[in-house]
Amino acid sequence: MQKPPRTAAIIVAAGRGLRAGAGGPKQYRTLAGRPVIARALQPFCTHPEVFAVQPVTNPDDTATFNEAVAGLDFRPAVGGGATRQASVRAGLEALAELNPDIVLIHDAARPFVTPDLISRAIVAAGQTGAALPVIAVNDTVKQVDAEGCVVATPDRAQLRIAQTPQAFRFDVILDAHRRAARDGRDDFTDDAAIAEWAGLTVSTFEGDAANMKLTTPEDFSREESRLTAALGDIRTGTGYDVHAFGDGDHVWLCGLKVPHNRGFLAHSDGDVGLHALVDAILGALADGDIGSHFPPTDPQWKGAASDKFLKYAVDRVAARGGRIANLEVTMICERPKIGPLRDPMRQRIAEITGVPVSRVAVKATTSERLGFTGREEGIAATASATIRLPWSPWGAEGQAS
C-alpha cells in the first residue's frame, strides 16, 4: 500500500483586513462567539492527514492571536511580511526543516473550510503537483475600462472563482516563491499565480460555495446571522453557592478581590458568584456540577482562583459548538455592599467569559436580616445562564430529545 503524503498546512493571518470595517484585523473578529482565525485553523489542526500546521501572523498581533486560538495544536507562529506573498514565503521557509511532501496554503479569512475540502486538496496535489479549489461563475461577467464602460463579455463557461486551500508539492512551490523573490516579483495575488509564472501546470478541483472569504462588513453581518440562526437549541441553567465567613481581610466576589473584615472558609478562593455561574453553565449543558469537575477533595484546587473554573465552563460550551447568550448572578448578603462594585463585577465576568458586558447582569439583595446571610455569617449567590447550541433532534448521548 502506498504511504499517504506527508502534508503540512500554512494559514496566512498577517493581513490587516481594512475593508472589513472597524473592530481590528478581521481574522480576530468573532462569528457566533468564536474568532475567525480559530474557525479557520481548527479543521487543519484536527485533520488526520495534516501533520503540521504553520500559522503566519503579524508580530504586533501575538497576544491577540494566542488568546484567539488557545487550545489548538499547531507550530509556533512566524511573522509575516508586507504582502501576502511575502507572508506565504515566510511560512514555507519555516516548514523547510520538516520537508513535507505536500503543503496546503489557506487564507485565515476563509473560516468555513471543511475536512472534506482539505482531503480533496491533498488528493489533487498528489496527482498533479499543483492544484486549487474553484467554483463555477453563475453570473454574467462584464469586463470594463477605466471609465466603467463595458468592453467585453467573457464566456463564463471558461471562468472559475479561485479559493483556498491551494495545494502543491512542497519543493516546487518553495522554489517558485524563492525565484519570484529573487526576480523582484511581489505582485501575485495567490500562490497558483506564482506557480503559473514559474511554468507549472495548475489543475483545479471542486471547491465549496460555503468556503467564502470574509471581506466586507456585510459579509460578517450575513454570516453572523446565519450562524446564530443555526444555534437554535436554547438552554437555561441555574446555579447556587454559599460560603461561610472565617478569618481574613478580603473576599473574592465575581472575580474581584474585595476588602472585608472577614474572609471565606473555602477549598478554593470561595468566590460564590463565579461558582454559581459555573454551575449554571454546566447545568445548561447537562454536564454535571462544579464539584464533579473540580472536587473539593482534590488538593490541586486548594486556593485556586475561580476564574479558571468559569473559563473551563465557557470552553465546554465552545467545544459543543455553542455560545453563551446571557449570564446573570445575584449576590445575597448584608455586607460588603455590592452596588458600588456592580459594574466592575460585570466587566470582570465579561473579561473571563468573552461575553459582551451588555449580556452580563449582576444584582444584589439581602435576606432582610433573616438567616445566616442576615446574621452576616456568610454570603450566598444564585445565577442563571442562557446558552445556544447547534440544534439537533438528538441529545448529547445520541438519543432523541
UniProtKB/Swiss-Prot annotation:
Keywords: Isoprene biosynthesis, Lyase, Metal-binding, Multifunctional enzyme, Nucleotidyltransferase, Transferase
Protein's UniProt keywords contain Transferase: yes
Source superkingdom: Bacteria
EC number: 2.7.7.60, 4.6.1.12
Residues that bind 4-CDP-2-C-methyl-D-erythritol 2-phosphate: D241, V242, H243, H267, S268, D289, I290, G291, T365, T366, S367, E368, F372, R375
Residues with site note (Positions MEP for the nucleophilic attack): R156, K213
PROSITE patterns tied to this protein: ISPD, ISPF
InterPro entries for this protein: IspD, IspD/F, IspD/TarI, ISPD_synthase_CS, MECDP_synthase, MECDP_synthase_CS, MECDP_synthase_sf, Nucleotide-diphossugar_trans
Reaction equation(s) it catalyzes: 2-C-methyl-D-erythritol 4-phosphate + CTP + H(+) = 4-CDP-2-C-methyl-D-erythritol + diphosphate; 4-CDP-2-C-methyl-D-erythritol 2-phosphate = 2-C-methyl-D-erythritol 2,4-cyclic diphosphate + CMP
Secretion signal, residue range per the UniProt entry: none
Family, as annotated: In the N-terminal section; belongs to the IspD/TarI cytidylyltransferase family. IspD subfamily.
The protein, known as: Bifunctional enzyme IspD/IspF
Species, as recorded: Rhodopseudomonas palustris (strain HaA2)
Source lineage: Bacteria, Pseudomonadati, Pseudomonadota, Alphaproteobacteria, Hyphomicrobiales
Name of the gene: ispDF
